[in-house]
Amino acid sequence: MSDMFLPARMRKLKIITLDQYSDSVVRSLHEEGVTQIDDISERIQQDAEWRQILKPSRATPYTGRVSSLLMKTSGILDFLGSVAAEEKGLRDTIREFINPPIFEKREVEELDTESLIERAEETLGRVESETRVMEEKLNELDSERSAVESSLSVAEKLKDFDIDFSDLQDSEYITGIAGRITAENLPELRDKLADITDELVISDREGENKAERILIIVTLKKHADSIASVLRRMEFERFEISELQGRPSEIISSSKTRLEEISRERKEIISKLRDINAEWEDELLVLREQLEIEKERNEVFSLFGETRKTVMLEAWVPLKEADRVIAVVEESSEGTALTDLEDPDPEEVPVLLDNPRFAKPYETFVEMYSPLKYNEIDPTIFMAFVFPFFFGFCLTDAGYGIIDALIGFILYRGLGKVNNFMRNFGIIMMSCGVWAFILGMVTNGFIGDFFPRFFNITLPTVIPAIDAFVNPQNILIMALTVGVLHINFGLILGARNNIRLGNMREALGSQIVWLILELGIILYLVGGMIFGAPLIILAFAMLLYYNGLFGLMDVSGFLGTLLSYARLLALCLSTGGIAMTVNILTGLSYEMIPVIGVVLAPIIFVFGHIANNAFQSLGAFINSLRLHYVEFFAQFYMGGKNKFNAFRAERNFTKIRR
């Protein structure tokens, strides 16, 4: 099998450069973004021979300052962004989801670290001079609003009491307590307080409902602790009244007035901050990105080794990019760097998936399962064909397929413009929707039995033999046939992997044996015992030889794996069955419920099918993944531990001026 079905071929690149060119080399590699920097500092510390030549390098002295400025920039952006979002409505959110604003990359100069720090300090100083006072004022208003709302809440609960709260404040001799207790506990509370002292006054009113009572207790201060202890045991909810002055009605009136004033003041400040955000947001986004990139560049030096005048680093580079990377290093070091390209140890190589453009979105699914081993076959291309087909098989409804494809298109053309994950997910959903449409049209599924039930017509594209409502047994045969082909392809990949790696025993005992058993069963069914029996006996002998008695038990497990593909039929029928039920309820509502049925029927139809499509699409997605992860990958996927992490300058808002 050609290298196109394997992860990217990698090489280890060793670079030695003069210290004066190290920053230039790092910047060039960072902008190219096709290498992974390897950490050699730990190896230097552990290897005595290396320690004689090199010492571990350190992050640059600018790292701390750059990190601090980055945190400050992010904090200002988060603050201004949260303020700008306060007035954003649902319509704005939906509009941005469907058609998010695209940031036009700004050309920036390639600055050294010191120059970038100076520029950042200047920019942040100007922004903070405008925002600091308003931010402090906004925090003060928010704190005051919380306090006023708390006072208002207490005053409204005590509004039935004709009392001035200043009379309840602690004095030298008396103390006042207000709170809430359940009505059933009130008699017991009175008795327990009477046992403590008769030097107290208890006033009570009905609370928000008859099950609770609002109390005000006035007593001598010397009894305060004893009474407080009893109140805690009786689940008494105490109100904070120490800051209240005046009568409840006065506090309610003044609190509402003050809350309105606070709201107006906040709106004025937020309006000004929104203007500041509009003026500075782009500049701050650019600055944050530059600081993030600079931080990575300054930190990466801690992975290097160094001598008095040179720096050494090691990087993993895809073979097809190696010549270009070496040329970049030569140019950035003015020809003074030494480079050496080595064949790697397969156990150490970080794995980079390298697939055609159409299969790229499915790499996420493979990486979610486990990183590949360097020399095993990458199943991404096969998954790109089979996953959407399985999804469509599970859904088999053309109407739902159209909806899913439209959702995928909206994601692709909307958030996909600014988010790579959403772009990939949109592509996957469009592919899945297309397959659901195709399979739905040939199996008589279009919003359930919509056309036959309401228009008494049959879809012209239906193949009668696989009409899901008439011949479900044929759909089952299709599902199991697909399952056998899928599993066998996995077995072939597994055998190929093991043979490639020299594990012939594993290939014979775990993959080839099942292919022989299947061939024997087919020959037995077609030609009888004389043709099939020898291969069946050979397969069982191989199971015993390579796997012992447990190998015979694996037969039932293998059969269960094949039967797992019956879930394709189960989900296919459940989609159509529930859709048909929604259509039946829609028809009954329209025909049997006078007047209101005309309104109710469309509601049942729309929301019923939306819910069914949502649940069935989710089920189709999960079960398609499961058939790959549990059934297909189990036949061949070995998995590794090292994933390629590119040392790349992520530029979403900037581009270097050349």
UniProtKB/Swiss-Prot annotation:
Where does it live in the cell?
Cell membrane
An example Gene Ontology CC term for this record:
plasma membrane
**Which Gene3D superfamilies did the record assign?**
1.20.1460.20, 3.30.70.2170, 3.30.70.2750
> Function, please?
Component of the A-type ATP synthase that produces ATP from ADP in the presence of a proton gradient across the membrane.
Residues that span the membrane, as ranges: 383-403, 427-447, 475-495, 507-526, 530-552, 568-588, 591-611
Q: Which organism is it from?
A: Methanothermobacter thermautotrophicus (strain ATCC 29096 / DSM 1053 / JCM 10044 / NBRC 100330 / Delta H) (Methanobacterium thermoautotrophicum)
A single Pfam family, by name?
V_ATPase_I
Similarity section: Belongs to the V-ATPase 116 kDa subunit family.
- Name of the featured protein: A-type ATP synthase subunit I
Specify the protein's topology with respect to the membrane.
Multi-pass membrane protein
Major subcellular location class: membrane
